[in-house]
Structures are given as C-alpha cells and as structure tokens.
A protein has these predicted regions:
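Ankyrin repeat (ANK) tandem alpha-helical domains that serve as protein-protein interaction scaffolds
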Residues: 1-276
Length: 276
C-alpha cells in the first residue's frame, strides 16, 4: 500500500483516528516517511484526536522529534500542556532539549501552570536553567504571580537569588519590576543589578532618596548604568550629593562601558568644577 492509498482510506473513513490506531495498516504502507506521517496526522485529525494518538503504544515508540512535531501541530496550548503534565507521558523518556520547542510554544498562562507544578517539572527532568528560561518568557503579570510565591521558589524549586534576580530583570514593566523588589527578599547585590535595568529618571530618584539603603559602591554601580549625558546633568543638579554620600565621580565612571567612558571623558568639562 502506498501513501496515496493510505490517504484514500483516511478520506473515506468516518473514524480517522482508528486508522492511525491500527498498527498493521500503517505497517503495510510502503515507504511511509516520518514527514508523510506527520502531514497525514495534521490533515486528518483534530487536536483532541492528536492528543489520544500520542498515547498509543506504537506512537510512543516513534522517534522523539516525531512525537514532538505531532504535539506541535496541536493548536490548543492547553492540550499541549496536558501532554506535558501527564505522568509518564509521551515525552518522559526524552531530554529537555528534545522537546524544548514544545515548551516554548506554550502560551504564558500554560507555562505558568507548568512552572507551578513541581512534580511535572521533576518528571520532565527540567533543570533550573530551563525553569529560569521559561519563567523569563512569561508575561509580566504571570512573572509577578510566579515570583510572588516565595516559599514555592525557595522550598520546591530551590531557585537561587541569582536566578530570581535574572527573571526580575526580564520584566518589561518598570512598575512591576519595582513592585517585585518590594515583595521578593533579595540581597542588595542582586537588587543593584536589577536597578541598573530601569529608566534613568527612576534610577535618579531611587539613588537620591536612598530607597533601598544602597552602599556607596552599589549606588555607584546604578549611577554607572545611566546614559552619559543624563549622568552629567544629574551631577550638576545635585552637586552636594556625592560628597555627602561618599561617592566619587571616578567610582561611577568605572562602571560605564568603554564607549561611554570615552564619551564621558570628552564631556568632562561640562561638569561643575566643584564636583570634579
């Protein structure tokens, strides 16, 4: 039987899933490639049927990438998630990198459900790097939900402060990011890293008001992440700030990228001489 004959059987069948369920029918099809099989499945089965298909024993024995490609053809993100949440599901024998595309294909709400299921994460052998990567791809609101559960992060996932801070840095909405700084207990070392990712104006306000009780070298790092022109204006506007807080211009400039250091050197005469 050819691939064309198999297609004809599927066209005329009222129970297309049963055709794929019949191991002998598929085995009798000569030269049926993996690509042909995936195409037939995508053309003739709906999402829920594809879900059932991946639980058939002969389909669970297919090469890992073929199983992933079948799952990727399921349009409903919740159904794709269901495959991942199923104990001893069709991907339990695979390494994370083999079904990473499937993880990435989930929408944010489904990724959050998976991240909040520590048993499934363990069953899928998802390491901390994979968990961090998935968390970074969440929407800002879902990141907040995920990161706000401190006990779960610490006791179940055992995420390090470094990983948590990297996820917070990936938040796009500055207000959400600052709210997380108030909610998530972090060492100032990591808070400083996060503060370097916010807007110049907000950095200026935080440093001026010492909102997070930063030490001079930590404040210098945040100031050193400002744009050169903005920093020069900040220096000229708050001439007493540096001497009062034990911060030197040099300690800030060393945090500038090399290109910014050169730019600053060319503009140093724009700085109030009393501060220089």
């Amino acid at each position: 039987m050819s691939e064309k004959d198999l297609r004809g059987i599927l066209e005329s069948s009222n129970d297309k899933l049963s055709v794929f369920a019949d191991r002998d029918t598929l085995a009798s099809c000569d030269n049926l490639t993996e690509k042909d099989l995936i195409s037939l499945i995508d053309n003739y089965l709906n999402d829920s049927q594809k879900l059932d298909l991946l639980n058939f024993e002969h389909f669970r024995k297919l090469r890992g990438q073929v199983r992933v490609d079948i799952a990727m053809s399921i349009s409903d993100s919740n159904l794709r998630l269901q495959l991942l949440l199923t104990p001893d599901g069709p991907f339990s024998d695979l390494y994370t990198y083999q079904f990473n595309d499937l993880l990435e294909s989930l929408d944010s709400s489904c990724k959050l459900k998976l991240l909040k299921n520590s048993h499934s994460l363990q069953s899928l052998k998802l390491g901390k790097d994979s968990i961090e990567s998935m968390a970074k791809s969440l929407s800002d609101s879902d990141k907040f939900t995920f990161l706000s559960d401190i006990d779960y992060l610490n006791k179940e996932l055992k995420l390090s402060e470094y990983s948590i801070s990297r996820i917070i840095c990936s938040v796009n909405d500055e207000n959400v990011k600052l709210h997380l700084l108030d909610v998530v207990p972090l060492d100032n070392y990591y808070k400083t890293d996060i503060l370097t990712t916010i807007s110049n104006t907000t950095k200026a306000s935080i440093i001026l008001n010492n909102t997070y009780n930063l030490k001079p070298h930590e404040a210098s790092q945040v100031l050193g992440s400002m744009d050169t022109d903005f920093f020069i204006d900040y220096v000229n506007e708050h001439t007493d700030f540096f001497s009062k807080n034990g911060i030197s211009i040099q300690s800030v400039v060393r945090y500038f990228p090399m290109k910014e250091q050169i730019s600053f050197a060319n503009k140093i005469y724009n700085i109030n001489i009393s501060v220089r």
